[in-house]
A protein has these predicted regions:
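Structured helix-beta-strand junction loops
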Residues: 97-98, 130-131, 161, 188-189
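Mature, structured domains of secreted/extracytosolic soluble proteins
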Residues: 89-92, 97-100, 108-130, 237, ...
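General beta-strand structural signal in soluble alpha/beta enzymes
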Residues: 7, 77, 102-103, 134-137, ...
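Class I SAM-dependent methyltransferase SAM-binding "motif I" and its flanking Rossmann-like core
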Residues: 104, 110-176
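Hydrophobic anchor at the start of a short beta-strand
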Residues: 73-75, 134, 223
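C-terminal and late-domain segments of enzyme folds
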Residues: 1-35, 42-56, 60, 64, ...
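Portal/gating segments that form or line small-molecule/metal binding sites
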Residues: 40, 46-106, 110
Length: 249
């Protein structure tokens, strides 16, 4: 059974992000089936910066949240930071066994450049198809969508979720301006999912014949859904749900 996708607006692993991290662990518990939940923090997007720091922050945060909620986790860095490590079959084996695969933020172009066609991405897809939670924060979330923007312009994402781009670090007071910029550079018909920091959405499929995908909001901020450039925005807060259309493969 395929696992849920989770998208996060950034500020991952900081104080205040605990509800979202606990939601990821709860979603992964069925795959773990009573053993320690295996968490792989994959700092690919941070490869130009401090990937080990990003991963260490993630490992510490998951361990802290698990202890608070009476869970046991085996959280570790899986250091995929370039083509060589993406081809490493030992790292791929760790990814294939994970119950939560978390892609923290960094540079938006790195994950879509490094992952496609690699052993690492094949292992992530295998784990996700087997029920693992696939989560991305900020640039990690952007990469999972069908399209993303970078400092060099727009580029295709990994198309795990389709029909929209993820807009991290979203704020209500600046959303209109953000949406206007989005309209200026987005491909025709592409929606935008805006996510505040320390806030994310977790996929909740609505059934095999559903025409939409449900996304449960978790965290202190808001999520914003604009179904097409210039369309009216719908917002939701923690515990509420947004729906995006199912885009056929």
């Amino acid at each position: 059974m395929i696992g849920p996708v989770a998208l996060h607006g950034g500020g991952e692993f900081l104080r205040g992000d605990e509800p979202f991290l606990e939601a990821l662990l709860a979603a992964a518990a069925p795959r773990a089936d009573g053993r320690s939940i295996r968490v792989a923090v994959v700092p690919t997007a941070a490869a130009r910066g401090q990937p080990d720091v990003a991963a260490a922050n993630g490992v510490a945060a998951f361990e802290r949240v698990a202890a608070t909620n009476g869970r046991t986790v085996d959280a570790r860095e899986v250091r995929v930071v370039g083509p060589t490590s993406a081809a490493d079959h030992g790292l791929a084996a760790e990814l294939a066994e994970a119950d939560v695969i978390h892609l923290p933020g960094g540079d938006p172009d790195l994950i879509p450049t490094i992952m496609p066609g690699s052993a690492a991405w094949a292992a992530i897809a295998e784990a996700h198809a087997g029920g693992a939670v696939l989560a991305g924060a900020s640039a990690g979330a952007m990469a999972l969508a069908s399209w993303t923007w970078t400092s060099g312009g727009g580029m295709g994402g990994l198309m795990v979720v389709r029909g929209f781009a993820v807009v991290p670090h979203a704020k209500r007071e600046t959303w209109e301006a953000t949406a206007a910029r989005f309209v200026a550079w987005a491909p025709d018909g592409l929606g935008a999912l805006g996510l505040a920091e320390r806030t994310g959405v977790i996929e909740e499929p609505l059934g095999p014949d559903a025409t939409h995908v449900g996304w449960r909001v978790v965290g202190p901020g808001e999520a914003f859904w604009m179904p097409a450039p210039g369309a009216e925005t719908v917002s939701a807060r923690s515990g509420e749900r947004l729906e995006t259309p199912v885009i056929p493969l």
